[in-house]
Amino acid sequence: VYPRISPVPTLSWAVRDLGCSGGVCVTASHNPAAYNGYKAYGPDGCQITSEAAAAISTAIEDTDIFSGVKSVDFDAALAKGDVTWIDDAVLERYYDAVLSKSVSNLSADEVAKAPLKLVYSPLNGTGLVPVTTVLERAGVTDITVVPEQRDPDGNFPTCPYPNPEIREAMQKGIELCERVHPDLLLATDPDADRVGVAVKDGEDYLLLTGNEMGVLLLDY
């Protein structure tokens, strides 16, 4: 169990890193807050298949919710060792793995000599700490975070549909860009497994599609 709110990718990583049978993340993802639910992951760290989901649904339907659901006192389970907290060493291994997969061959010091100026928004979700940590370790330190969307808030007060691939969710970030003039606007959805990118295009900002980002990365 993570002791704090954490993004989906860190859960997926921990399942494999710790050799778990599966993982569950409670999240509304990039959907409106009313759609809060959970994502389930298999032992490979990937989201479960439709076949596995169907089997789980059947098991739930066959369970008597009044007498068939097992429960345990959380503190007692911690004391017994049946439940354990995920420590920071797991996160450090995750950060190292992400940085090792960077498409850039530049060191952090080399990146810092040609600084990249970013505006970033976690869209009131979980991305702030891991995203800024990885960027800063990669040498990108000039990061301005959208203040209204900095802190976690499961009600998503600044945009009811926090999908960074749509302009409505990026609007606060675009407004900040017009004041601080960054090279790039980045935003992650609330559980930080989806990214949106916007770049200056004349007097406006252009949102890149996933296909466009993929082509740019491939070309680089």
Please identify what each model-predicted range represents.
Residues 1-35, 137-197:
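N-terminal small/polar loop signature for handling phosphorylated ligands or for N-terminal nucleophile
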Residues 2, 32-38, 45, 120, ...:
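Generic secondary-structure boundary/loop-capping signal
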Residues 8, 50-53, 211-215:
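Amphipathic alpha-helical transducer elements in NTP-driven molecular machines
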Residues 12, 132, 215-219:
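Short, hydrophobic alpha-helix immediately C-terminal to the catalytic nucleophile
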Residues 13-17, 126-133, 199, 206:
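Short glycine/threonine-rich loop-to-helix capping motif typified by GTGT followed
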Residues 36-176:
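Gly/Ser/Thr-enriched, mixed-charge loops and adjacent short helices
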